[in-house]
């Protein structure tokens, strides 16, 4: 061996290895699935590269994975004749984890073994799963197209470091030898290995072969070795749906996603006609750990005429459906397709539209057939789905049907109410869908803006996530009915309160001088001062006009570091509230000012959750409490 050196693992690799050995031990047989899956990927990459450089096959185009074991040496060897690796690639792939956010992810792992195994599985362990059953792993590899003396040797005990060196290797591809720990002898058994491969890797399009030694009947002659194929070795998506079991669909999902959990639902679809393609789409049962990371890769596996082209082809799914996993096999795209060609291509656009509709139909069917399962989906991916109305105007109505909200109809923060349910419960004469946005469910639920609606028995949607205000800027109507924020000043809301119009007008006339005094006092700090009959228990509220930026939108701008225009509120006073009546009767201008400022601060605090000068508010409150006692 030449160029031998010992290198230290990246700290995240050391941490992952320790976590994996302890957390995944109960499901240790998955090491074989992961290593065979990697070998399959290596074959896919070679096929793709060989489209433009055929000599990479090195006169050996029959791609396969081979498995052998040695009971005496207590070793299992998995070898492939795929793309192989250079020395630099070995260091990058086996010594480091390139995923952004890995450190934060590993820090989130706790002491709950069952939960940890799910999280680590979701992260995708790949090659490192070899250490679940091994106390030493040896790798011999050579990249396709490299010379025989450019082979690479890698070995580690899965602790702090690894050894790497240059070797000669006749054949291209990768050979991984696992030196089993004590107590792992169950895997030194032909039947056991066959059963694991059948369970996890039957769907792999690559032949998986196991070594069979045939005893020679003649004395002095050596035993012969043959290789027996033990999987179907046919791409799963090319088979008829009726031939595929649910277990095979689930295992294929785990193969392409490297997720350990079963998918929630899936759809296998073959289209013939103007465009010919096969798609296999999966909705995961849990969100990927790095879904909100901007560097998170997403998209479908792309095949053209059954030849693997690329992973993470994001051009076939809109961003709000980035959690959808699966593949598309197109007969219409060229074999030499690149990401750049996909970007501006009518075939791609048509496929994207069709696949988007298919994914939305899957979710719509789930919502109708199994509300409990759909709720599980919503808890994991609801926030992402809320990006849909802004991103996909074509499918806005279909997306809107899939949205779920908390509402005044249910005394719960759970987002379970659909817009169709809301519309079905609308009161007689109601022509709008009412909603409120706030910083929290409690703030929305207890907002004074809801008082009139509770009195009238009108349901209001309670929106309390940061994305909600932005979403409602695009979600303007549903089923022919406009959305209306209850925190906006609007004539239609005033009309709702017009029960005793003559009596209300009389009160307003009597309090005209009071309203003028308040206007004079506050000046241009507020847009308008008026009396309102929308309130029952609250003395005053502030509102914004329909065409102006809302409080929640202003908060979003501020959180994003953008300049926020001044929001001027309408100050609306409840003439039936005792505090307003008391304020109207105060003749002393200083005391009157304190009362009005206090009422305004209360309204602003209820609306924004903060005050510009909380100390002044406390001082006024204390003064009034003391004067009341005197």
UniProtKB/Swiss-Prot annotation:
Spans annotated as B: 340-555
Lineage: Bacteria, Pseudomonadati, Pseudomonadota, Gammaproteobacteria, Enterobacterales
Spans annotated as A: 1-339
GO cellular component: cytoplasm
Coiled coil regions in record: none
Principal place of residence: cytoplasm
Family: Belongs to the heat shock protein 90 family.
Recorded GO MF terms: ATP binding; ATP hydrolysis activity; ATP-dependent protein folding chaperone; unfolded protein binding
Name of this protein: Chaperone protein HtpG
Keyword Hydrolase attributed: no
Protein task: Molecular chaperone. Has ATPase activity.
Keyword terms: ATP-binding, Chaperone, Cytoplasm, Nucleotide-binding, Stress response
Subunit structure and binding partners: Homodimer.
Record InterPro entries: HATPase_C_sf, Heat_shock_protein_90_CS, HSP90_C, Hsp90_fam, Hsp90_N, Ribosomal_Su5_D2-typ_SF
Top-rank taxon: Bacteria
Intracellular or extracellular location(s): Cytoplasm
Name of one Pfam family that matches: HATPase_c_3
Segments of this protein annotated with the region C: 556-630
């Amino acid at each position: 061996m030449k160029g031998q050196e010992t290198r230290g693992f990246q700290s995240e690799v050391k941490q992952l290895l320790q976590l994996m050995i302890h957390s995944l031990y109960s499901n240790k047989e998955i090491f074989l699935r992961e290593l065979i899956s990697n070998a399959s990927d290596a074959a896919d990459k070679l096929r793709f590269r060989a489209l433009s450089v055929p000599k990479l096959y090195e006169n050996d185009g029959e791609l396969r994975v081979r498995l052998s074991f040695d009971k005496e040496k207590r070793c299992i060897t998995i070898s492939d004749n795929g793309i192989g690796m250079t020395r630099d690639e070995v260091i990058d792939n086996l010594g480091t984890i390139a995923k952004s956010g890995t450190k934060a992810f590993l820090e989130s792992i706790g002491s709950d073994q069952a939960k940890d195994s799910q999280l680590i599985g979701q992260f995708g362990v790949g090659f490192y799963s070899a250490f679940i059953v091994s106390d030493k792993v040896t790798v011999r590899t050579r990249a396709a197209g490299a010379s025989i003396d450019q082979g690479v040797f890698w070995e580690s005990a899965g602790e702090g470091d690894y050894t790497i060196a240059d070797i000669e290797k006749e054949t291209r591809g990768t050979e991984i030898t696992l030196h089993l720990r004590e107590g792992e002898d169950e895997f030194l058994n032909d039947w056991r290995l066959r059963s694991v491969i059948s369970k996890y890797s039957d769907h792999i399009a690559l032949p998986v072969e196991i070594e069979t030694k045939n005893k020679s009947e003649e004395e002095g002659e050596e035993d012969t070795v043959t290789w027996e194929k033990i999987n179907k070795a046919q791409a799963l998506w090319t088979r008829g749906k009726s031939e595929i079991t649910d277990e095979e669909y689930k295992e294929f999902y785990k193969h392409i996603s490297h997720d350990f959990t079963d998918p929630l639902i899936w759809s296998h679809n073959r289209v013939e006609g103007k465009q010919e393609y096969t798609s296999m789409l999966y909705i995961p049962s849990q969100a990927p750990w790095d879904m909100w990371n901007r560097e998170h890769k997403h998209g479908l596996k792309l095949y053209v005429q059954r030849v693997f082209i690329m992973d993470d082809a994001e051009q076939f799914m809109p961003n709000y459906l980035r959690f959808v996993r699966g593949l598309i096999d197109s007969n219409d795209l060229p074999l030499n397709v690149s990401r750049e060609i996909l970007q501006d291509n009518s075939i791609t656009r048509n496929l994207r539209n069709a696949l988007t509709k298919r994914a939305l139909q899957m979710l719509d069917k789930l919502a109708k057939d199994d509300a409990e399962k759909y709720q599980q989906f919503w808890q994991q991916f609801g926030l992402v789905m809320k990006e849909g109305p802004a991103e996909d105007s074509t499918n806005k109505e279909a997306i809107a049907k899939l949205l779920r909200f908390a509402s005044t109809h249910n005394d719960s923060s759970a987002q379970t109410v659909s817009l169709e349910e809301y519309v079905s419960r609308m009161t007689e004469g109601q022509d709008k869908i009412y909603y409120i946005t706030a910083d929290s469910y409690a703030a929305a639920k207890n907002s004074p803006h809801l008082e009139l609606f509770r009195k009238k028995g009108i349901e209001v949607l309670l929106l309390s996530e940061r994305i909600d205000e932005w979403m409602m800027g695009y979600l303007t109507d549903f089923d022919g009915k406009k959305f209306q924020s209850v925190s906006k000043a609007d004539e239609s809301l005033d009309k709702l309160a017009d029960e005793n119009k003559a009596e209300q007008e009389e009160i307003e006339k009597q309090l005209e001088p009071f309203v003028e005094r308040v206007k004079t006092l506050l000046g241009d700090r507020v847009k308008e001062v008026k009396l309102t009959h929308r309130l029952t228990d609250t003395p005053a509220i502030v509102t914004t006009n329909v065409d102006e930026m809302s409080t929640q939108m202003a908060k979003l701008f501020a959180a994003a570091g953008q300049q926020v225009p001044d929001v001027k509120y309408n100050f609306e006073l409840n003439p039936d509230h005792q505090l307003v009546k008391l304020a109207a009767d105060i003749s002393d201008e200083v005391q009157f000012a304190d009362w009005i400022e206090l009422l305004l601060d209360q309204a602003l605090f209820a609306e924004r959750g903060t005050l510009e000068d909380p100390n002044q508010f406390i001082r006024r409150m204390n003064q009034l409490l003391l004067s009341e006692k005197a």
